[in-house]
Amino acid sequence: AGHMAWMERASAGAFRICTTVDDLRACLSNGTISGIMHMEGAEPIGPDLDALHLYHAMGLRSLGPVWSRPTVFGHGVPFRFPGAPDTGAGLTQAGKALVKACNRLGVMVDLSHLNEAGFNDVARLTEAPLVATHSNAHAVTPSTRNLTDRQLAMIAESKGMVGLNFATVFLRPDGRQSPDMPWDAVLRHLDHLIAKLGEDHVGFGSDFDGATVPQGIGDVTGLPALQDVLRAHGYDEGLLAKLCHRNWFAVLDRTWHPPR
């Protein structure tokens, strides 16, 4: 949080921490780089949740209760291939309180890295759409980190969202980390997610934080190449705009609100 605040101060207006969808739209229209403060793994927040309110005041608007390990809030899925996300117990009492507090504050709860029992608990408790910011289809790549068709159906019912993860271990049908892979695997995941969720509920989740990604993408500068591949695959400009930003704006608009 402090580093993002420093980036905003040091950028001379080129970077902005966004806490509303109007902020995001303004940045898109004027060319400002926008950032959403997200916490992956809620270890910095204790079970009393006092720190959650401090982070929210600093701009936190998206939170994953766990990374792929246990916390005081729940259990993350270990990285296994092949494997299923049914890997342990659900949310703790502190985890359930965290979901409710996020709902009251208007903080999006991220289901990526959460095991199946925890996913089910969030689905029962939350008042917001179900969102997995960087996960793929288990039916295509049977990794513990990917979402089963049953989970996708629950996300669809909530009018939620899945962001496609570019990490090769979650894209390749063999679960390997190698970046040398055809575009076909990316297309299979996107086609499956759109078939299960509808084109209004899928976007890009990237995971550009050190994960091995397809060599055709490489980093954020490879996104235009991905768009060209999707055009050749038959995706029209309207669908590309949804995948790139419109669907994220829409689900955040349904999730973010002033504290209540």
Question: Where would I find each of the regions flagged by the language model?
Answer:
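A metal-dependent hydrolase metal-coordination microenvironment
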Residues: 1-49, 68-73, 77-89, 93-96, ...
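Structural preference for beta-strand elements that scaffold enzyme active sites
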Residues: 16, 34-38, 61-62, 106-108, ...
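Mid-to-C-terminal alpha-helical segments outside catalytic/metal-binding sites
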Residues: 218-260
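Conserved, mostly hydrophobic/aromatic
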Residues: 20, 59, 109, 134, ...
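Histidine/acidic residue-rich metal-binding segments in metalloenzymes
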Residues: 47-57, 79-131, 144-158, 184-200
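Short acidic/histidine-rich active-site segments
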Residues: 166, 196-220
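Active-site environment of divalent metal-dependent phosphoester hydrolases
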Residues: 23-24, 44-45, 69-74, 114-120, ...
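A conserved active-site cap/scaffold subdomain adjacent to cofactor or substrate pockets
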Residues: 161-170, 175
